């Protein structure tokens, strides 16, 4: 298919048996998309390859292997800059701060192995394991969050101060999920019991790092993103007493602002991403009771999270957080088209230890918690 912004999309889907007895099946999805956008220099080129295989030895058992590979190429879009803090329409909505030689290359690979077995009409078991990898290769010219500083402390609102990020990172994620469904009756009460366990692991691989070229040159051979008149003597100044830019500013009045940038003379600093690992274990129990017109769902989940700081070093430290999370839901069917309902749910999201223990980030931070109470009537008349 073809569409706006030079969009070209090609999709294909192949499926069928791989054996005469049709116990071994396959499916292959292929996708390609190349599209521009209404924003200057923005584009997306995406390739997806997703094969799936299923082995069905009998009507009660199924084993699946699913693979999804995705290659994505584009540029980061950091938004539209305007003159000063005035009219939002002072620059075209197409304006982006990207340079022609910027890029964002991403690769994702997800592999999932899943198993389902039905013991009988009332008991079934499901298990799945997923391993996913993500690689990021980024080069971007982006705003330094201000306009170009002048020597007297004012700003040139026609020029945006710029900085450069050149970053490479790789992540690996693993998930393991198991749950058992049991349907049974206790007298006149129907029960749907769910018991499960899941595990996840997220890890930042070795080598994660970023080169940063900040906005203004310093006399000590480094660069910074801000200019201080009080510390003016620390900066490299031009003949007019203005700070010399390390990364040339983006000129909002020029038609060549998105041209290629010569980065060979930039002064870079380096930021290393320490190896990091987070794991989580979850155990949950849930039952849905049904008695005539009344339905009640009661569930309880226990989550345990562990962060590994300074991972695989002599200073490795474990930070653990855990929580019980309840949930209750109720429905009373007054009439076929009228239902009364009520819900009580709690939520919990820990803040990763790389943030909560970092005083430069303002931490430590408490976990995010939530609690929902809701009651009402749902009805359909037409």
Regions found by a protein language model. Give the residues of each.
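Outer-membrane beta-barrel translocator/receptor signature
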Residues: 1-49, 57-61
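Transmembrane beta-strands of outer-membrane beta-barrel pores
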Residues: 2-4, 32-36, 47, 69-73, ...
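Short sequence motifs at beta-strands and strand-loop junctions characteristic
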Residues: 3-6, 41-45, 99-107, 166-172, ...
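Outer-envelope beta-barrel architecture signal
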Residues: 8, 22-26, 59-63, 109, ...
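Residues on the lipid-exposed face of transmembrane beta-strands in outer-membrane beta-barrel proteins
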Residues: 12-16, 51-55, 111-117, 176-182, ...
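Acidic/polar loop-and-plug regions of large Gram-negative outer-membrane beta-barrel proteins
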Residues: 33, 54-118, 122, 131-171, ...
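Structural signature of Gram-negative outer-membrane beta-barrels, strongest in the C-terminal barrel
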Residues: 58, 171, 190-202, 272-382
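Face-selective signature of the C-terminal outer-membrane beta-barrel domain
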Residues: 116-134, 162-310
């Amino acid at each position: 298919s073809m569409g706006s912004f030079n969009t070209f999309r090609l999709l294909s889907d192949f499926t069928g048996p791989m054996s005469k007895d049709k116990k071994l099946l396959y499916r292959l999805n292929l996708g390609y998309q190349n599209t521009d956008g209404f924003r200057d220099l923005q584009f997306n080129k995406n390739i997806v390859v997703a094969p799936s295989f299923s082995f069905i030895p009998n009507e009660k058992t199924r084993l699946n292997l699913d693979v999804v590979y995705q290659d994505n190429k584009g540029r980061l879009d950091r938004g539209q800059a305007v003159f000063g803090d005035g009219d939002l329409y002072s620059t075209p909505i197409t304006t982006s701060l990207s340079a022609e030689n910027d890029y964002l290359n991403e690769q994702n690979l997800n592999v999932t192995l899943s198993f389902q077995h039905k013991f009988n009409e009332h008991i079934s078991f499901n298990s799945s394991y997923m391993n996913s990898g993500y690689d990021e290769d980024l080069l971007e010219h982006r705003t330094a969050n201000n306009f170009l500083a002048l020597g007297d402390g004012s700003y040139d609102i026609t020029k945006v101060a710029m900085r450069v990020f050149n970053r490479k990172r790789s992540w690996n994620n693993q998930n393991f999920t198991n749950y058992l469904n049991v349907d049974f009756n206790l007298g006149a009460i129907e029960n749907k019991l769910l018991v499960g366990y899941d595990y996840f692991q997220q890890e930042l691989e070795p080598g994660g790092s970023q080169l940063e070229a900040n906005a203004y040159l310093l006399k000590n051979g480094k660069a910074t993103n801000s200019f201080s008149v009080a510390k003016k003597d620390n900066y490299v100044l031009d003949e007019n007493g203005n700070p010399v830019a390390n990364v040339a500013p983006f000129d909002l009045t020029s038609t060549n602002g998105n041209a290629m940038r010569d980065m060979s003379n930039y002064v870079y600093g380096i930021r290393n991403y320490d190896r990091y690992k987070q794991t989580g274990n979850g155990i949950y129990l849930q039952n849905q009771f049904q008695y005539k017109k009344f339905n009640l769902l009661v569930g309880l989940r226990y989550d345990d999270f562990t962060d590994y700081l300074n991972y695989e070093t002599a200073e490795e430290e474990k930070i653990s957080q855990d929580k019980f999370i309840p949930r209750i839901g109720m429905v009373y069917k007054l009439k076929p088209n009228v239902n009364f309902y009520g819900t009580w749910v709690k939520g919990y999201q820990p803040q990763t230890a790389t943030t909560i223990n970092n005083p430069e980030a303002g931490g430590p931070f408490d976990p995010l918690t939530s609690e929902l109470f809701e009651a009402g009537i749902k009805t359909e008349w037409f």
